[in-house]
């Protein structure tokens, strides 16, 4: 069954003076999906979020929510909620009052409001915190209160503006899992903004990568990582080693190293291939074309991050710390897993 497109941007452009921040963007978010805007600072992702929210108006184009043109509607008329990086909680109110503030403004009866606040706090693992204040809880708990405040209103669309940026690594991991769990549980159509690739992969059905106001590629996290469409995408989605290659009927040749050609490779002749660090291993045996020299080793806990020189090119790979302990200057033979390669159709 095809999912309904619930949020849609049609030919949307946004200018600030003479500066074009968003250039003719088309974007759809199917009902119940989490779509993440990912890109470097200044790429336009937050501007798109603000356009969907109604905090900015497009210079050109239209915005639809649930089939209705909301281009010129205010944020109050769009039935959306936003979770901010800064939490935006009221310090003079209790947590229960913060969570229930929107319902209070809507005139929800006191008894119903109290019950829904209790339920919302329980959803984010803060049951019994109604009477505490913002300065009595941690940053991670504050972000969960902000999430409860958004969920309690049961919005059509939920927007996330880099909500985990102020949290440490462990809190980010647990909070992103909680966001994804609740988004799927309540089937809320959501748009998420981040510059963190691992965060985008963990929470998203679909990731949209932006650069300089343009969409570079759209796809599932797996597709974007395994089949990047350009040199920019290959490097932005994670570490990537890029090699000139020759493609024949049965093989891929990289610096004389012959690899079985994967079935999905359609290219013939000369081209560029990419290989992720985890698809390269080191061996004590191999052909002369595979010989490499260790140039740098960094211990990363469960693995070593190793830089080797291979045919005059420095490449990055990962080595399991329990299996091999390479030292600078040692020689090994490099092995590439054929199905860890991708072809760059656009090497620009």
UniProtKB/Swiss-Prot annotation:
Subunit structure: The complex is composed of two ATP-binding proteins (FbpC), two transmembrane proteins (FbpB) and a solute-binding protein (FbpA).
EC number: 7.2.2.7
Enzyme class, spelled out: translocase
The protein, known as: Fe(3+) ions import ATP-binding protein FbpC
Gene Ontology biological process terms in this record: transmembrane transport
Listed GO MF terms: ABC-type ferric iron transporter activity; ATP binding; ATP hydrolysis activity; transmembrane transporter activity
Domain of life assignment: Bacteria
All copies of domain ABC transporter, residue ranges: 7-237
